[in-house]
Amino acid sequence: MKRLHLAPWTSLVLGLAFLSFHPVYLAEASSGSNSTSTVHHPENLETLEQCPNVDFCPQAARCCHTGVDEYGWIAAAVGWSLLFLTLILLCVDKLMKLTPDESKDLQA
């Protein structure tokens, strides 16, 4: 039963350990991308109409990143998992501390 009292501290330490790895993943994701920091916007739509045979999709895929990358989804999943694990462990800790003498329904 002694291990259950350490459960909130264990989840806190694990959460901090996972958070310390998050900047490493962000650095790898930003260094591995081939995107440039300059953004080129056409002055008007006539510029695109001047090049009817050019496929802009590969360049747009290289330069325009939309949504969350794979590291962002992993970090979000780990964060939510740790939150729910902490809540579950806190509830288990409360249930373990509940004695038969105490009333479950406390008067307000």
From Swiss-Prot:
The keyword Repeat does not apply. The chain crosses the membrane at residues 72-92. Its main location: membrane. Keywords: Glycoprotein, Membrane, Signal, Transmembrane, Transmembrane helix. Residues 93-108 are cytoplasmic. It comes from the Eukaryota. Disulfide bonds: none annotated. The keyword Ubl conjugation does not apply. GO terms for cellular component: membrane. Residues 28-71 are extracellular. It is a single-pass type I membrane protein. Coiled coil: none annotated. Pfam families: TMEM213. PANTHER family: TRANSMEMBRANE PROTEIN 213 (PTHR36293:SF1). This is Transmembrane protein 213. The lineage of its organism: Eukaryota, Metazoa, Chordata, Craniata, Vertebrata.
